[in-house]
């Protein structure tokens, strides 16, 4: 529902666009869900985040004149069409307003939530004249991770090219790969890794999917909190488990990425999107597994 509204399309437009083979899914599942969701919002006299953006855009277009000298936008690589229209409505009523956006197309991993990377890559096409300033120093990690991840990302020539440098030439972040096999092999390997780490160090366990935590057997205690957080303990060591998407922006002394295997539920994910989603999502990159590479 929010993807449909984020793209600025109505149910009628969706009906007219769908191909015959997708019509049963759209008319039998999607449209009834959207209509029931809208009905529920009316009953509770509530709006969601996308509603708030759409309503604010309509207010500006109908004559409301917000008086801003500067508009600052963070995480611009995640911008969606509804947010783009909102920014344009703010600028339209006050043309001298300066728009300052910070983003990194190497971190664009939320297409499934409605983001449209073309708005970032073709900024001047959508917003007019601009000046681009590059920030190429990272304070999160050092080499060899910086060099290896840069080469990995830039294999996709559609990514903006830049030379990322660590904040200090002495900063070091190592990458190690471990093979496992057989039932319980993953859990045993993780236990071996943990036993070699300093006791007072922080550790994150990450997976491409939330179900990856199940690869840890009975040697690990897994607790699912009411807030959705997953806590894992092994002996006296307590750790957080989360998906790679949930971990974005966080830091830890050590990070263990589980189940880097091939297959449908591996990393990269080989699960194909439903063709129905193409009606409400932006166009994907042409490079194979482009978003999965950025997630990794």
Regions found by a protein language model. Give the residues of each.
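Conserved helicase NTPase motor core
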Residues: 19-122, 137, 249
């Amino acid at each position: 529902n929010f993807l449909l509204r984020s793209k600025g399309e109505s149910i009628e437009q969706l009906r007219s666009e769908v191909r015959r083979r997708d019509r049963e899914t759209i008319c039998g599942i999607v449209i009834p869900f959207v209509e029931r969701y809208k009905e529920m919002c009316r009953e509770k006299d509530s709006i969601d985040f996308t509603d708030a953006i759409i309503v604010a855009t309509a207010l500006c277009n109908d004559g409301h004149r917000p008086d801003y000298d500067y508009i600052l936008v963070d995480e611009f690589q995640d911008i969606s069409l509804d947010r783009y229209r909102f920014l344009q409505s703010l600028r339209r009523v006050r043309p001298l307003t300066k728009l300052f956006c910070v983003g990194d197309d190497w971190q664009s991993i939320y297409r499934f939530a409605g983001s449209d990377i073309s708005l970032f890559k073709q900024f001047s096409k959508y917003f007019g004249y601009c000046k681009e300033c590059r920030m190429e120093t990272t304070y999160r990690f050092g080499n060899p991770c910086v060099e290896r991840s840069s080469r990995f990302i830039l294999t996709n020539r559609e990514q903006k090219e830049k030379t990322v440098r660590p904040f200090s030439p002495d900063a070091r972040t190592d990458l190690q790969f471990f093979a496992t096999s057989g039932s319980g092999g993953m859990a045993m390997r993780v236990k071996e890794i943990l036993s070699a780490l300093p006791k007072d160090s922080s550790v994150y366990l990450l997976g491409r999917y939330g179900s990856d935590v199940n690869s840890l057997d009975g040697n690990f205690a897994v607790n699912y909190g009411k807030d959705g957080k997953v806590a894992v303990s092994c002996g006296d060591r307590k750790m957080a488990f989360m998906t790679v998407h949930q971990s974005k922006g966080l830091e830890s002394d050590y990070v263990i990425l589980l189940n880097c295997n091939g297959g449908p539920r591996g990393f990269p994910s080989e699960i194909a999107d439903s063709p129905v989603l193409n009606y409400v999502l932006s166009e994907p990159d042409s490079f194979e597994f482009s978003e999965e590479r950025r997630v990794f």
